[in-house]
Amino acid sequence: MIRIPFHLRQTPGRTLHSLVRSFASTKPADLSGTQEKSTRQKINFHELKHPSKVPQRPHKSTIDGQSTPTRIPVDAQKGQLLERLSLVDLDSAEAHRTLEDAIEFASQILSVDTDDVEPLYTVLERERLTLREDRVSDGNIQQDVLRNARVTEEENFVAPPENIPLEQEPRK
């Protein structure tokens, strides 16, 4: 990755030609990012034309801490069922803890009141998005698509052979 020093970054109104010219006139030491801290310019984020869309303060949770459910244990039989359905290995104690944490988090989300909240079309609903125009075609690209598959059978994709089989012996 090439890091461009701040003083060489393109500013509004600066052409590519002038940027290349100033880039070519710099010393290799300037491009390595080994400048002293005293010569670096500090960025004032409040003066940027497009400041970050990431909130500066965390969102206060509406989840009541007292109404959160206790830890929901996952027994061995449910663990095996989830392993088989999700094709994820849950052998370790850490995997079981992660699964229980995920279930606890999901149950907290269920307690959030969303009655008067209007659904979003997208997270960036207020942003102007340029979408491509839909073009209807008859397709006929089946062979092109199937070339991407590692294994095919009768003009269909085949799931990876490393998957966990559906029938399993119960663990001891």
UniProtKB/Swiss-Prot annotation:
It catalyses: L-glutamyl-tRNA(Gln) + L-glutamine + ATP + H2O = L-glutaminyl-tRNA(Gln) + L-glutamate + ADP + phosphate + H(+). Its EC number is 6.3.5.-. Allows the formation of correctly charged Gln-tRNA(Gln) through the transamidation of misacylated Glu-tRNA(Gln) in the mitochondria. The reaction takes place in the presence of glutamine and ATP through an activated gamma-phospho-Glu-tRNA(Gln). Keywords: ATP-binding, Ligase, Mitochondrion, Nucleotide-binding, Protein biosynthesis, Transit peptide. Residues 51-73 are annotated as: Disordered. One of its GO terms (biological process) is mitochondrial translation. One of its GO terms (molecular function) is glutaminyl-tRNA synthase (glutamine-hydrolyzing) activity. This is Glutamyl-tRNA(Gln) amidotransferase subunit C-4, mitochondrial. It comes from Culex quinquefasciatus. InterPro entries: Asp/Glu-ADT_sf_sub_c (IPR036113), GatC (IPR003837). It comes from the Eukaryota.
